Amino acid sequence: MARFFRRRKFCRFTAEGTKRIDYKDIETLKAYITETGKIVPSRITGTKAKYQRQLATAIKRARYLALIPYTDSHE
């Protein structure tokens, strides 16, 4: 029975010392959105609750301002 080593999840924003998550930082936000447009939960990403709330608000704000799409492109 082989045991697989799982990498410990850590909060990227705590490690970087981020105070606020900016809704204009599209590349950072895209890392926390699935290809279907859903926000990835913190139990998968390892983000702390404080930053997960900021992340959700920033993603919703960016969607509202049409910086990122609500869903994937329907072609």
Swiss-Prot record:
<comment type="function">
    <text>Binds as a heterodimer with protein bS6 to the central domain of the 16S rRNA, where it helps stabilize the platform of the 30S subunit.</text>
</comment>
<keyword id="KW-0687">Ribonucleoprotein</keyword>
<protein>
    <recommendedName>
        <fullName>Small ribosomal subunit protein bS18</fullName>
    </recommendedName>
</protein>
<dbReference type="InterPro" id="IPR001648">
    <property type="entry name" value="Ribosomal_bS18"/>
</dbReference>
<dbReference type="InterPro" id="IPR036870">
    <property type="entry name" value="Ribosomal_bS18_sf"/>
</dbReference>
<dbReference type="GO" id="GO:0006412">
    <property type="term" value="P:translation"/>
</dbReference>
<dbReference type="Pfam" id="PF01084">
    <property type="entry name" value="Ribosomal_S18"/>
</dbReference>
<dbReference type="GO" id="GO:0070181">
    <property type="term" value="F:small ribosomal subunit rRNA binding"/>
</dbReference>
<keyword id="KW-0689">Ribosomal protein</keyword>
<dbReference type="GO" id="GO:0003735">
    <property type="term" value="F:structural constituent of ribosome"/>
</dbReference>
<keyword id="KW-0699">rRNA-binding</keyword>
<keyword id="KW-0694">RNA-binding</keyword>
<dbReference type="InterPro" id="IPR018275">
    <property type="entry name" value="Ribosomal_bS18_CS"/>
</dbReference>
<comment type="similarity">
    <text>Belongs to the bacterial ribosomal protein bS18 family.</text>
</comment>
<dbReference type="GO" id="GO:0022627">
    <property type="term" value="C:cytosolic small ribosomal subunit"/>
</dbReference>
<comment type="subunit">
    <text>Part of the 30S ribosomal subunit. Forms a tight heterodimer with protein bS6.</text>
</comment>
